[in-house]
């Protein structure tokens, strides 16, 4: 769910926690836009933020931490795909610890599997997201540089855990009033495994088309961490111009947008496309010349454009890595390899989730959230 923990439009006027707040009567359930939020008595004073395909987000006052938080109500149990995405996000975020990745503060749900209809995920409240920010203003070069650095800093951690995010886009980058940025929405994340063609990988792959790397559309397997770098390149281009760089209307239109700017791929680049049908299609297209980045972004920093060029490289094997991007001259004022933490160990899913029925996924969600239940032993 895009921008899950983000409040719209800079969060203006949102009441902050104050002493003497009167909690709701125990047992009383607050309702937000017709949706009951069974999160009291710890969380009260709910205010609507937004909603996605399978849930709603509200802000609330946390009486324990004495601050406002975001609560995502998820009702996924009717659909296998929603269960899968919910479980994957919970599994990853409970194990990740990084300043530029949204964390989970608390999870509320019914005490029994049979009674569990919804899951409430409590996260830090972030006032806006990059999508909303770009709709409302043109960013300065300093802001672009700082946001890009934080995206890459978070992505370095994610990739060090051997995870692909697979759905990086402006609405999945949460921002607060002090310009701190956190990556959210890990529902499409996967273990990086270039040899494995995940069951249902392409059919289930619904990441926003505009930020998809060309190899996702051209190959049937073997994705690497470079797909996330492509998405970050698209985000950088959007920060420079306030508009998406490759706004394709459908699959082929998306490819045509990419080739219209990058030019026709070289023979060497074509050779890395496994899918012969896709390779033949590209070879059948009229030759296109690369458009100079400075022509597309005449007012932009030349170092930013050099980094953009290295991210938006057609051949994934030649695309810059996250570590190389962090060390690029454009980011030199922030670059500090001693303050860019990596995961303690690679992340592993105990099992491939794609083929599990929703009933089994519900059981796994119930187990995964048990540590937050009253009386549960302290989790890691």
Curated annotation (Swiss-Prot):
Using the UniProt record, give the first listed, main subcellular location. Answer: cytoplasm
Name a GO molecular-function annotation: MAP kinase activity
Q: Which residues carry this modification: N-acetylalanine?
A: 2
GO terms classed as biological process: animal organ morphogenesis; apoptotic process; Bergmann glial cell differentiation; BMP signaling pathway; cardiac neural crest cell development involved in heart development; cartilage development; caveolin-mediated endocytosis; cellular response to amino acid starvation
Q: Where does the record place it?
A: Cytoplasm; Nucleus; Membrane, Caveola; Cell junction, Focal adhesion
Q: Which GO terms describe its cellular component?
A: caveola; ciliary basal body; cytoplasm; cytoskeleton; cytosol; early endosome; focal adhesion; glutamatergic synapse
Q: What class of enzyme is it?
A: transferase
Query: Any known activators or inhibitors?
Result: Phosphorylated by MAP2K1/MEK1 and MAP2K2/MEK2 on Thr-203 and Tyr-205 in response to external stimuli like insulin or NGF. Both phosphorylations are required for activity. This phosphorylation causes dramatic conformational changes, which enable full activation and interaction of MAPK1/ERK2 with its substrates. Dephosphorylated and inactivated by DUSP3, DUSP6 and DUSP9.
Q: Name one matching Pfam family.
A: Pkinase
Give the modified residues of type Phosphothreonine: 199, 203, 208
Q: Which residues bind ATP?
A: 49-57, 72
Modification after translation? Dually phosphorylated on Thr-203 and Tyr-205, which activates the enzyme. Ligand-activated ALK induces tyrosine phosphorylation. Dephosphorylated by PTPRJ at Tyr-205. Autophosphorylated on threonine and tyrosine residues in vitro. Phosphorylated upon FLT3 and KIT signaling.
| Catalytic residues in the record | 167 (proton acceptor)
Q: Where is the Protein kinase domain?
A: 43-331
Q: Which UniProt keywords apply?
A: Acetylation, Apoptosis, ATP-binding, Cell cycle, Cell junction, Cytoplasm, Kinase, Membrane, Nucleotide-binding, Nucleus, Phosphoprotein, Serine/threonine-protein kinase, Transferase, Ubl conjugation
PROSITE patterns documented for this protein:
MAPK, PROTEIN_KINASE_ATP, PROTEIN_KINASE_DOM, PROTEIN_KINASE_ST
Q: What is this protein called?
A: Mitogen-activated protein kinase 3
Q: In which organism is this protein found?
A: Mus musculus
């Amino acid at each position: 769910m895009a921008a899950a923990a983000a409040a719209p439009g800079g969060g203006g006027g949102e009441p902050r926690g104050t002493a003497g707040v009167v909690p709701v009567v125990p047992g009383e359930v607050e309702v937000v836009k017709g949706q009951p939020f069974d999160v009291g008595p710890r969380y009260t004073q709910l205010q609507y933020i937004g909603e996605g395909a399978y849930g709603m987000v509200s802000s609330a006052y946390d009486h324990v931490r004495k601050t406002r938080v975001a609560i995502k109500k998820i009702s996924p149990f009717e659909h296998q795909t929603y269960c899968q995405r919910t479980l994957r996000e919970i599994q990853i975020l409970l194990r990740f610890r990084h300043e530029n990745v949204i964390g989970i503060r608390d999870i509320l749900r019914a005490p029994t599997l049979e009674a569990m209809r919804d899951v409430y995920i409590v996260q830090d409240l972030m006032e806006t997201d990059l999508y909303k920010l770009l709709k409302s203003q043109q960013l300065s070069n300093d802001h672009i540089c700082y946001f890009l650095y934080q995206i890459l800093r978070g992505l370095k951690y994610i990739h060090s855990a051997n995870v692909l995010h697979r759905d990086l886009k402006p609405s999945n980058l949460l921002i607060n009033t002090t310009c701190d940025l956190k990556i959210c929405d890990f529902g499409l994340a996967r273990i990086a495994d270039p040899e494995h063609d995940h069951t249902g990988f392409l059919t289930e792959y619904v990441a926003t088309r505009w930020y998809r790397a060309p190899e996702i559309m051209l190959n049937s397997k073997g994705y690497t961490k470079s797909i996330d770098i492509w998405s970050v390149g698209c985000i950088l281009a959007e920060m420079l111009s306030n508009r998406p760089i490759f706004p394709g209307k459908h699959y082929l239109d998306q490819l045509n947008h990419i080739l219209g700017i990058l030019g026709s791929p070289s023979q060497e680049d074509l050779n890395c496309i496994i899918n012969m049908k896709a390779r033949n299609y590209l070879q059948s297209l009229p030759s296109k010349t690369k458009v100079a980045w400075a022509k597309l972004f005449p007012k932009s920093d030349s170092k930013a454009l050099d980094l953009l060029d290295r991210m938006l490289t057609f051949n994934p094997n030649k695309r810059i890595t996250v570590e190389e991007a962090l060390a690029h001259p454009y980011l030199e004022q922030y670059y500090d390899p001693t303050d860019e933490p990596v995961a303690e160990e690679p992340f592993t899913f105990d099992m491939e989730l794609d083929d599990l029925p929703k009933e089994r996924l519900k059981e796994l969600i119930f187990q995964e959230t048990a540590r937050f239940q009253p009386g549960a032993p302290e989790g890691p």
